[in-house]
A protein has these predicted regions:
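N-terminal accessory nucleic-acid engagement/regulatory domains that precede
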Residues: 1-50
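Conserved pre-motif I regulatory segment
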Residues: 44-82
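Short basic/glycine-enriched coil/helix segment immediately N-terminal to the Walker B
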Residues: 73-75, 158-162, 178-193
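Walker A/P-loop
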Residues: 75-98
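The Walker A (P-loop) glycine that initiates the GxxxxGKT/S ATP-binding motif of P-loop NTPases
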Residues: 83, 140, 199
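Inter-Walker segment of RecA-like/P-loop motor cores
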Residues: 131-177
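SF2 helicase catalytic motif II
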Residues: 170-173, 183-221, 226
Length: 233
């Protein structure tokens, strides 16, 4: 399936280049290293790391953030992040992912979230920090065909060719299991990525075995790192 995904995407891209006479409307976005610098500047401006009082909410957020940033230098693999609601999990997980991706020359960060309202909230936060052109929302409520200005995003949604992708459980696992070439096209761009499952406990129990099997395969054989996030134990 990984080889098939490469072939399908290459075929689509070659056809697109031929039809456009070599001119591309695609914008792959900013390099991960530069995005990490953008986040660093954001944290400095917002003074996220300055509060070191453990008996305050902001102090605990800073502590969690520092720990996640420190863990970003660890070797690739499987990770778990358990942070109660209000603990700054969104920023902390992004900080880990960007530092980890920069340290290991990884291609992109993929957030997998069960609810579209949370996707929209998180994607907006990421856009404010990293820039609109670097964050792709990929779910059923998004329509990139309504404006010519959104054409690069429409093209990126076909194969997830952006540095930060925010998507649903359904879209992510369809890319891994579905038989349609249009779904499988994204698969090779999942390799060598940091994959963050927010609210990981929401994966349906009846689907856990195959889902965990492919997640472990991505980490073991395809250079990805996986973070399982939850606000509950």
């Amino acid at each position: 399936r990984m080889i098939y995904s490469c072939l399908v995407d290459a075929d689509f891209l070659d056809t697109e280049a031929f039809m456009k006479q070599g001119k591309t409307e695609r914008d792959p976005g900013t390099r991960i290293e530069e995005l990490y610098r953008k986040l660093d500047k954001y944290l400095e401006n917002k003074r996220w790391l300055e509060n070191k009082k453990p008996d305050t909410i902001n102090g605990r957020r800073s502590e969690i953030l520092r720990h996640c940033m420190d863990m970003g230098t660890q070797e690739k693999g499987m990770f778990r992040l358990t942070v109660p609601t209000g603990g700054g999990k969104t920023i902390a997980s992004l900080a880990f992912a960007l530092r980890h991706a920069a340290a290991h020359q990884m291609k992109r960060i993929i957030y997998v979230i069960p609810y579209t309202n949370i996707i929209e909230q998180n994607a907006q936060v990421f856009r404010e920090i990293l820039g609109e052109e670097n964050v792709l929302e990929s779910h059923c409520n998004i329509d990139y065909t309504s404006s010519e200005e959104l054409r690069p995003m429409q093209l990126a949604s076909e194969n997830w060719d952006k540095p930060v992708v925010v998507t649903t459980n359904v879209q992510f696992f369809e890319s891994l299991f579905a038989s349609k070439s249009s779904k499988c096209r994204k698969l090779h761009n999942i390799a060598n990525s940091v994959i963050i499952f927010d609210e990981a406990q929401m994966i349906p129990p009846e689907h856990l075995k195959p889902c965990l099997a492919v997640i472990e395969e991505l980490a073991a054989q395809y250079g990805s790192s996986v973070v399982l996030c939850t606000a509950t134990q």
